[in-house]
Amino acid sequence: MTYRELGQTGVKVSALGLGGSHIGTPKLSSAEAVRIIRAALDAGLNFMDNSWDYHKGESEKRLGRALKNGYRSKAFVMTKVDGRNKKEAARQLDESLKRLGLDEIDLLQHHEVIRFDDVDRVFAAGGAMEAFLAARKAGKIRFIGFTGHKDPEVHLHMLRTAQAHGFRFDTVQMPLNLLDTHYRSFEKKVLPELTAAGIGVLGMKSMGAGVILNSKALTPTECLTYALSLPTSVVITGIDSMKILKQAFQIGGSFKPLTTREMASLRAKSAAIAANGEYELFKTTSAFDSTASHPEWLGEESSRTQRLTAE
C-alpha cells in the first residue's frame, strides 16, 4: 500500500481509504463488515472514513466493533457530524465517540457543507466550530476538516471564511473524478488552493457511488487510477465485499501515476457524458443530501440569511 502525507499534520495515511457508508449498508451483515474492515487494516489500508449519520449510526457501530482487539492502533479514524450549532455538533460528536467505543477520534469533519449558509452557521457565535475547537482542546479529536459535494464555490467560501477567523483546516474532502473536471469542477477550482496551502486533500466519489459506471463510458480502474493520480492524500472508496476490497488493492498495489497525456486522454473520453452533471447526482440532485431531510440538524438560519430574507 502506498502512503501519503496528510497535509501538514505529520501523519501518513494510506492512499486508499475505506468508505464508511458502504460498511453500514443493510445488505451487508455486521460480521462481514467487521471482516472487511479488519482485512483492510491487516493489509495496510489505515484510513477509515465514517459519519454520524451513516445508516442511523450503524456504520460507526460496525467500525467500533472492528477496532477492538488491538485494531485501533492500525487505524486512522475519521468521522463527521452534521450539526451546525455548538450544542448539536457536540451532541453528535459524543454519540459518535460512544458508538465507536473511542475516547479520541483522529479527524473530525463538518459534514455536507453544501450551502453558503452552512459556512455562516459553522463560524457564527455559538456555531459548530466552537464545538470542534472545544473538543480538540479536551482531547476528543486531533484534527479538523470539512466535506461537501455540491458546489466548489461553497468550498472556497468555507476556506476564505476560516482564514478570516484565523483558522486553517487540516483536511478538506470533495468529489474528485473524471466527470468533475468538466462540470462545477472541484479539481480546477479548489484543489489548487488546497495544495498551495498544504491542506490534506481527501478525494471521494471517484465512481459517484457507482452512478458514473452506469454510463458505461469508464471502468472502475480508470476512475480510481485517475483520482489517485491527482495530488490527494487519500482517495476514499466504497467497499462492501471482500471481492471489491481485493480489486481496490490490486489497483492501489500496482498504482503508477498517470502521465499528463494519459490524464488528458481520459478527460477527453469522459467529456461527452459530463457536460450537464447527469452522472454526478450528488451535485445535481438532493439524493445524497442527508441534511436536506433533517433541517433540525442545521438549527436556525444564519443572521445574514434572516436579514436578507426579511420583508
Where are these regions (language model features)?
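Conserved, mostly hydrophobic/aromatic
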Residues: 6, 18, 40, 48, ...
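Short histidine/acidic/glycine/proline-rich micro-motifs that form metal-
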Residues: 22-24, 52-54, 81-84, 177-181, ...
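Structured C-terminal cap/extension of enzyme domains
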Residues: 41, 46, 165-166, 189-311
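A general structural detector for well-ordered alpha-helical segments in enzyme core domains, enriched
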Residues: 2, 32-36, 59-66, 92-96, ...
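Glycine/proline-rich, positively charged
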Residues: 27, 84-189, 195-202
